[in-house]
Amino acid sequence: TYAIGKFTNGFLADRSNINRFMTTGLLITALVNLCLGFTNSFILFAILWGISGWFQSMGAASCVVGLSRWFTDKERGSYYGFWSASHNIGEALTFLIIASIVSVLGWRYGFFGAGIVGLIGALIVWKFFHDTPESMGFPSVNVPKQKKEMSETETADFNKAQRQVLLMPAIWILALSSAFMYISRYAINSWGVFYLEAQKGYS
């Protein structure tokens, strides 16, 4: 659900008020996490987990759209780098903090803790994550470019260039590298805990 949500919610975020969009996603994710802490049924747990994944995916889409609305082409790469780093740092911190909570209070409190932090985060997003510069009285950072009609020859050359890019081996190597990197990352995230328990005796 998270993967499908990242795909579909990107289109929705483009057409939405990202303040409300991201706040809604984070708020519902937080509430679902609180519900997960009370759940005893496996089926209900799986359903709630899927719902959580869907609404979590609204966050990345909102942030990417926000970067495009608030920063110019020259600035966007730098701020995207900060955003990407914060995502990974935040994930690492959650492992440490939630693991500490679970080891002391039990697994249910891991969801309670995440839910409470999510509620606080939703409030912060609603207060400070604004939709567009215009909504705050600032000028738009994206000046519309005058469109130029391309001739048939230019259109053909453009389409040919696109096909050439898709045929470049380096593009496919990068795409496959990214795919395998994420497979390794999520395999470690998902199964690393079980490995440490089964093979290393951690509890």
Give the label of every model feature segment.
Residues M168-S203:
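Extracytoplasmic gate region of multi-pass secondary transporters
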